[in-house]
Amino acid sequence: MTRPGAGRWLLLRYLQVALLVRLACEGARVALVVLAVDRTGSAGFGGALVAALLVPGVVAAPPAGALADRVRRRRLFHAGCLVCYGAGLVVVAGAAGRAPAGVVLAVAGAAGCCTPLLTGGLTSLLGDLVPAAARGRAFSLDAVSYNLAGIAGPALASALAATTDSGLALAALGAAAVLGGLLVLALPLRPRSGGGRALRPADLGAAAALLLRDPPLRSLTWASAAGQAGTGALPVVCVLLADRYATPWAAGGLMTAMALGSLAGSLVYAWRPWGVRRPERTVAVMLLATGVPLAAVPAAPGVALAFGCFALAGCCTGPLFAALLAGRDRYAPEAARTQVFTLGASLKSTFAAGGAALAGVCQTAGPVRLVLAVAACQALAAALGTVLLRGPAARSRAVPLSGPASRSPDG
């Protein structure tokens, strides 16, 4: 049984790992481009490096999650993946512009195969580290780690590259990921009894079947992914809005406002969670709420009001993401929990990329129509979540506030 206060210390140790590896993950996207330009003079090669780091993670998410659900010694597996990711960044930092481009891209791709364990895979461990009654707050704080990394990671990479060297900047981020991986070894994850069974082809589809058949998981997964198609388009929309307001800084400033709002929303939700009995409903409500301030952006006469609208929308995405994480943990069975997390994260990334690409194709529609389309996408996603929640298991899957009683806090 967990001692009073022990869960708090375990959560703190987990958050140290999460911040280190996610700072590295977010910062690497900027550092890779800067490194490529410095060493080769080609921003295109930088884009190829970023793609090599990100795309394999989408493909590797199902097998990585399934393997994590089967492996017996979880600490070694998760620590090894994080260390390999960080080591890959360090190798790229030394080899870019000096070794053949194909070799450097292959190393980045190999590191990218580990990214599902930095995001959803790492989050899936919280259910084994934190007492059931504290998991709602724990997932909110984990959402904060994503927000902080998304804001601070690129800034840290830029600052390190400007003050030292682009290669050293990427190597430092890689070292942070390696340190995070080593700290995983201090987390009390017990070896699985009966673990180590060989991975079968049927195991790879276990989470996909759950996301299609289980009403709560189906609802929160596909609703959040559909909403992400809209928010994925926002970087393109913000560039067009900056031109509309004749304010160049608004291209990044509006996205920063949304990120800061999301951070604030996550902190408030961690302090006072709501809707914890049915997180899938919280996801749908927050999707709808996200679209309301975005729909008001066209009426904003100046960039200041648009900035406020984006910040308010961000305040809604913080609780949305925390409820999504809590819902995955609550409804995913033990045998497929990590795979549900990694596959869900992969779907969100895919939908976001699709939204960004579609916005780029449709940019001639103008910022007003595009931002209204993003707002409508959130409303449609909320409606989709409500429809997908219908099913024979929807009512029976509601669980008490304390969460599943069958899972011990220390795994």
Segments the model singles out, each with a brief description of its role:
Residues 128, 176-199, 387-398:
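Helix-loop junctions on the cytosolic side of multi-pass membrane transporters
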